[in-house]
Amino acid sequence: MKKELNSWKMSKIQPDIYKIFLVLIFLIFSTSELTAEIKKPNPDIKPREVIEIQLDALMKNDIPSKDNGIIQTWFFAHPNNQRVTGPIERFKYMIKSDSYSMLLNHKSYEILEVYKSKGISTFEVTILDKDKKYYKFKWQVEKYEVDGFLKNCWLTTAVSQPMPMGSSI
């Protein structure tokens, strides 16, 4: 009788363990899929490409997940910039504020390099927001020179307040 009871308990426990195992496998794969979408800084990415990565992500902010564009933008923010604008939840709040919300889900952008030196590049960025209004920004990226995994990567150090440019036709 005791052996039958133990056998019954084991058969009852095994499906629960199996379900937990399946849930864990699902979470591992779905989490790695989300992080695979985030591009990481590396020395091969040029200054203009940093801005393109950030703007492309902000253009589709909630794809593949909520605030993915803001998170992608955060990954290419210079550590000094992150200290001022972070942590990430504060950065999300800042981007969603009136000052920068036009970057979220914008329709298009143009990037024009206006200054370049050995370690700093400055661009004029014009975006057409989802309400078909134009805004201009000064966007600055710098090469990170400190030893570590970001060494020689171009990262955003500053984005100006937007300058309204009017509506499209």
Residue positions per predicted region:
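TPR-adjacent "capping" and linker segments in tetratricopeptide-repeat scaffold/adaptor proteins
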Residues: 41-43
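Bacterial N-terminal signal peptides
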Residues: 20-30
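Exposed beta-sheet edge and beta->alpha loop/turn motif
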Residues: 113-169
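Short, aromatic-enriched amphipathic alpha-helices that serve as compact interaction elements
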Residues: 46-62, 72, 76
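Short solvent-exposed beta->alpha transition segments
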Residues: 64-120
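Bacterial N-terminal signal peptides that target proteins for export
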Residues: 4-21
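Low-complexity, polar-biased intrinsically disordered regions enriched in Pro/Ser/Thr/Gly
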Residues: 60-66, 147-148
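Boundary at the C-terminal end of the N-terminal hydrophobic targeting segment
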Residues: 34-38
